Amino acid sequence: MTSKSLFFKLMKEDMKRRLWAVAFSLLTFFFAMPMAAAMGIASIGKEYENWLVNGTGYAEIGADALKHTKILRLVGEVLGFENAFLCVLVAAAAMILGLTGFLYLHSKKQVDFYNCLPVKREQLFAVKFLDGFLVLFAAYLINMIAAFAIFCGNGIQGGSIVKMMLSAFATHMVGFLLIYAVMVIAVLLTGNLFISILGAGVLYGYAPAISLLLSVLKEFFFVTTGRNSDMG
């Protein structure tokens, strides 16, 4: 019981030091989802007024049907996989949170301070790692729900978009954890900020480089590879 209470107390104290990350994450995801949804719907609303006066340009589609179709498309652009900015944002957040969460290891004073605490290193690592994930998880989830509410308030049935929205959310969280874990490993293996960034670049590029090397070697040394690709 004491160990559990200490763990959550450490999480709370660490989160206080990450308030800047919490605020920044909430703000950036607010612009990426709820704000994007509201601005997109406002733009469609102006088009809708024009369609009521001048027609939609489609004989078989009325203004209301076209408005609904465009809002549905907007849902995918904001909450789905089509939102490229959201993917970039998640990746950038993973790198920043992974880097800043464990930079204390590069400071002798901070390391001495944490070593003086009656806390196991494994527990301290778990606190830092989990807090970094929760910052992104909470910011994404809160703003996703806000954007979802905006769409539902504009005539979109929630059941029709929940599956797509949750699929994108789960995929982004898995991607975040992978990028985040690699950055944390880079920080643990190196000794300063600049080398950590370089190390992360090497780790991020390792798998693509191996994949590219294998494909090139196949083209050079395996004749059937080129033939199979041509036949396909």
Which functions belong to the PLM regions below?
Residues L6-M11, V119-V127, T190-G199:
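Hydrophobic, small-residue-rich membrane helices and short re-entrant helix-turn-helix hairpins
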Residues M1-F24:
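Aromatic- and glycine-rich beta-strand/loop motifs that create alpha-glucan
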Residues E47-E82, T224-G232:
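Long, glycine/tryptophan/cysteine-rich extracytoplasmic
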Residues D14, Y104, D112-C116, V184-L189:
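Helix-loop junctions at the membrane interface of multi-pass solute transporters
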Residues Y104-L134:
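Helix-loop-helix units of permease transmembrane domains in multi-pass membrane transporters
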Residues R17-Y58, F85-I96, A200-I210:
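Hydrophobic alpha-helical transmembrane segments of multi-pass membrane transport/permease proteins
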Residues G80-Q110:
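Long, hydrophobic alpha-helical segments
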Residues R73-G76, G80, L130-G191, I195-S196, ...:
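Secretory targeting signals
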